[in-house]
Amino acid sequence: MGSVKDLVVLKEPAEKPGLGRFIFSNRYSVFDYGEMPDKIEDKGRALCMVTAYFFEKLEEAGIATHYLGLVEGGKVRRFDEVENAVNEMEVKLVRVIKPKNGDYSIFKTLKGNFLVPLEIIYRNSIPEGSSLLRRIERGEAKPEDFGLTKIEAGMRLERPIVDFSTKLEDVDRYLSHSEAKEISGLSDEEFEALKELVVKVDEIITREVSKAGLINEDGKIEVALDDERNLMVVDAVGTPDECRFSFDGFEVSKELLREYYRKTEWYDKVRQLKGQEGWREAVGLPPPLPDEVREGVSNLYRAFCNEVTGRKFFDAPKLKEVVSQLKEVLE
């Protein structure tokens, strides 16, 4: 399925939805490399529980999702019904159709029940080192594209910027809104509804994580059209892998792992070779994480899950303590 979760297909999707189960693993991936050498203990269960929590919050707000429930003891249950953290989730399946050689014309012919081939990104702030700043520097985007006169590092935005990238290509690339609409297979009305949808999801994530003292900086969602062409949120949502959060100014997201690897010689090779044919083999195996970093990140996922969902699934220190320990280890 992917580098961080596995898919068990119970019924293949066609024009009507299929049925499947996600198995959230302890694997992680950075820089589109694929599976990294270490496992982050309890990450899979933590992400599964957080995703279920947010899918149910979205449904309460009238937002459709492909979520059907968590699997515990062979039974499908709601979040409040499970006794322990699990790593398995039952979902409706849609078709995932990969464009051939960059040709997205097939998406204009599909009636429904397919993954929209976009990552939909919201940005509530512009941190130092943001990819958006780099794109503006290179002339690939400009503030006016997002309804702003300027975009600077450290900005907090009054309303979120909505941004797009490809989802089903070997290396994701950012898209203008017109490019995103063109490849998506969506009508004008559906595309406008998609932009409104990501803002609503952003608001719900912001509200929920603020209870744990976290700030929602930016994040991404994936969306599908169901068999009646209604938009629904799919995959995973509201987790530190999908979003970038901060706690007392400290990064709480997968970005921590990226930052660690940016200091390695392995990353220098990734930066030089990424996107070329066979680049993953050419860069070689990444170095493993030091034990204290691996354990600190593991506790970060555990504490995030406990405090955002309001249920103590994991025996872990408080988020504040975990952040303090990680600061010492990483800085």
Curated annotation (Swiss-Prot):
Native source species: Archaeoglobus fulgidus (strain ATCC 49558 / DSM 4304 / JCM 9628 / NBRC 100126 / VC-16)
Phylogenetic placement of the source organism: Archaea, Methanobacteriati, Methanobacteriota, Archaeoglobi, Archaeoglobales
Enzyme Commission number, as recorded: 6.3.2.6
Protein name as it appears in the record: Putative phosphoribosylaminoimidazole-succinocarboxamide synthase
Broadest EC class assigned to this enzyme: ligase
Family to which this protein belongs: Belongs to the SAICAR synthetase family. Highly divergent.
Keywords: ATP-binding, Ligase, Nucleotide-binding, Purine biosynthesis
Listed SUPFAM superfamilies: SAICAR synthase-like (SSF56104)
Coiled-coil stretches: none
